[in-house]
């Protein structure tokens, strides 16, 4: 049986489902992503458009949340300054495990065209990133694709993999 295959057997006339706990847990996690939006610049406009009726993020099971305690995906969209770095780290730490991060746009990925002393050259220097979304500014369809890539990544991992990292003091 493949890792994510569900088999249906006939047992006395009743269907029986054979699968793994990892498959069931990851299926639930991947189809109910609650996103904490952290929009900082132009990419935030495209991120907001993805939640509107035309693109309808809800059909992927993605719901935008305003609180990090209710979210399991953080979408960082736009230029990250050094003043925001501590704040974004605090928001990330407040999210419960398992948690994932999507870096949206060239500015969030690499600092974009703003190579200054006040700009963080990629949000992966502050928080771990799972999916990088290139472009300036990426279209809502691209953000939907990034969510689907994240869903595939979640379905492949072990349900017990996401343990809190050891903190270095």
Curated annotation (Swiss-Prot):
Molecular functions (GO terms): 4 iron, 4 sulfur cluster binding; iron ion binding; NADH dehydrogenase (ubiquinone) activity; NADH:ubiquinone reductase (non-electrogenic) activity; quinone binding
Reactions that this protein is recorded to catalyse: a quinone + NADH + 5 H(+)(in) = a quinol + NAD(+) + 4 H(+)(out)
Listed cofactors: [4Fe-4S] cluster
Keyword Lipid biosynthesis: no
Membership in a protein family: Belongs to the complex I 20 kDa subunit family.
Protein function: NDH-1 shuttles electrons from NADH, via FMN and iron-sulfur (Fe-S) centers, to quinones in the respiratory chain. The immediate electron acceptor for the enzyme in this species is believed to be ubiquinone. Couples the redox reaction to proton translocation (for every two electrons transferred, four hydrogen ions are translocated across the cytoplasmic membrane), and thus conserves the redox energy in a proton gradient.
Protein name (record): NADH-quinone oxidoreductase subunit B
């Amino acid at each position: 049986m493949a890792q994510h295959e569900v088999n249906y057997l006939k047992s006395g006339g009743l269907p029986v489902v054979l699968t793994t706990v990892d498959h069931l847990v990851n299926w639930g996690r991947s189809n109910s992503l609650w996103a904490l939006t952290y929009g900082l610049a132009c990419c935030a406009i495209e991120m907001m458009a993805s939640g509107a009726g035309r693109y309808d993020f809800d059909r992927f099971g993605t719901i935008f949340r305003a609180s990090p305690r209710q979210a399991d995906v953080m979408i960082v969209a736009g230029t990250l300054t050094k003043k925001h770095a501590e704040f974004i780290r605090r928001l990330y730490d407040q999210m419960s495990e398992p948690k994932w991060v999507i870096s949206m746009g060239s500015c969030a990925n690499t600092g974009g065209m703003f190579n200054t002393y006040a700009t963080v050259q990629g949000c992966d220097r502050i928080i771990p990133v799972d999916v990088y979304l290139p472009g300036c500014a990426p279209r809502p369809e691209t953000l939907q694709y990034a969510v689907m890539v994240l869903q595939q990544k979640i379905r492949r991992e072990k349900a017990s993999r996401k343990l809190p990292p050891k903190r270095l003091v």
